[in-house]
């Protein structure tokens, strides 16, 4: 790339920075005064004319200034050499705030609230997807001799509790045997494999001559409940925070704010964007029509995945106007995702 192209990119970068900060169209005189571009106002005007002709900036209404287009923002983001990481104090504060969450729900609620505050955008966090989860532990508790509580804990920290009504009461020895059998069948397996294993266990034991009818019945009833829990309870869940941040920037959406809010409420578009995040640590920025959703055409969506030990739990990110502090948003999304994974990975 020649020096003229490099210089024009510096002009574009200055226009993006000033427009994000001020919301005002940027003129050549303002750029020369605010930035050490090393060239005259006339040269900057010429560079702006080229940038406009190539579709990187545009002139809104009758203003003398220019604003970035989607293409301009994309060029700016693609050429971010290095996103400045958060300070050690900021990182410690994020980790401490998330670590005090008492369970998965609390950690994710804290994360979405924190990310919305840090970015001043709408924050979105996807609950760990069940399809990628494994059973960490199964606990079986006798509420009464004929009524059991099954507690399934996944490696992502998700906890599901189910009640099993038995046909016949079982004693302490049979309860311990039931706990061992179910635990051996489930623990360490992906949820889909675990559901098959527990179903096979029930089938195998139903005709076992060494198994009491009461215990075989308890295994069968427990297996039915567990299969429903592991396989059928697969709805995707999203947490949203900071929706009010969008209403503070209504002008940025050009009358499309209602459709953005409707898309967030319906969740389908957001879940599709998050589902594309398969690599923790990689941040994806979709600008305007890159979201491939007409309702979101006036937005930018910054997403990543969170997880632990190389395993992705789910996606997260922010939704805001295209007039966004991209370097700061990318840094905050990456940091919060990293520490969600750390916190959940140690539980």
Swiss-Prot record:
GO terms for molecular function: DNA binding. The keyword Ligase does not apply. GO terms for biological process: negative regulation of DNA-templated transcription. The gene is hrcA. It comes from Mycobacterium sp. (strain KMS). It comes from the Bacteria. NCBIfam families: hrcA (TIGR00331). This is Heat-inducible transcription repressor HrcA. Negative regulator of class I heat shock genes (grpE-dnaK-dnaJ and groELS operons). Prevents heat-shock induction of these operons. Gene3D superfamilies: 3.30.450.40, Heat-inducible transcription repressor hrca homolog, domain 3, Winged helix-like DNA-binding domain superfamily/Winged helix DNA-binding domain. Belongs to the HrcA family. InterPro entries: GAF-like_dom_sf, HrcA, HrcA_C, WH-like_DNA-bd_sf, WH_DNA-bd_sf, WHTH_transcript_rep_HrcA_IDD. Keywords: Repressor, Stress response, Transcription, Transcription regulation. It holds the Pfam family HrcA. HAMAP family: HrcA.
């Amino acid at each position: 790339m020649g020096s003229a192209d490099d210089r024009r990119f510096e002009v574009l970068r200055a226009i993006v920075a000033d427009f994000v900060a001020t919301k005002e169209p940027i003129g050549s005189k303002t750029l020369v005064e605010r930035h050490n571009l090393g060239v005259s106002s006339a040269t900057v005007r010429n560079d702006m004319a080229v940038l406009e002709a190539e579709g990187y900036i545009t002139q809104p209404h009758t203003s003398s200034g220019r604003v970035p287009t989607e293409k301009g923002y994309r060029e700016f983001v693609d050429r971010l050499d290095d996103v400045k990481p958060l300070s050690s104090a900021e990182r410690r504060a994020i980790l401490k705030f998330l670590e005090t969450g008492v369970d998965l729900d609390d950690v994710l609620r804290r994360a979405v609230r924190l990310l919305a505050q840090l970015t001043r955008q709408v924050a979105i966090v996807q609950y760990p997807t069940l399809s990628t989860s494994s059973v960490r532990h199964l606990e079986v508790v006798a509420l009464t001799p004929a009524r059991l509580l099954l507690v399934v804990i996944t490696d992502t920290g998700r906890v599901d509790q189910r009640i099993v009504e038995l046909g016949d009461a079982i004693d302490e020895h049979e309860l311990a045997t039931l706990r061992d059998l179910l635990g051996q069948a489930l623990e360490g397996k992906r949820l889909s494999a675990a559901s098959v294993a527990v179903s096979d266990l029930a089938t195998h034991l139903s005709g076992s001559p060494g198994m009491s009818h009461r215990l075989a019945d308890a295994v069968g009833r427990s297996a039915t409940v567990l299969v429903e829990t592991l396989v059928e309870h697969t709805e995707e869940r999203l947490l949203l925070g900071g929706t009010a941040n969008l209403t503070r920037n209504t002008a940025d959406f050009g009358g499309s704010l209602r459709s953005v809010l409707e898309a967030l409420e319906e969740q389908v578009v957001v879940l599709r964007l998050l589902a594309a995040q398969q690599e923790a640590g990689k941040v994806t920025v979709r600008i305007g029509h890159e979201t491939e959703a007409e309702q979101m055409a006036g937005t930018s969506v910054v997403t990543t995945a969170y997880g632990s030990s190389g395993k992705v739990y789910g996606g997260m990110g922010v939704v805001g106007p295209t007039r966004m502090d991209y370097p700061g948003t990318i840094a905050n999304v990456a940091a919060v995702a990293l520490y969600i994974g750390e916190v959940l990975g140690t539980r």
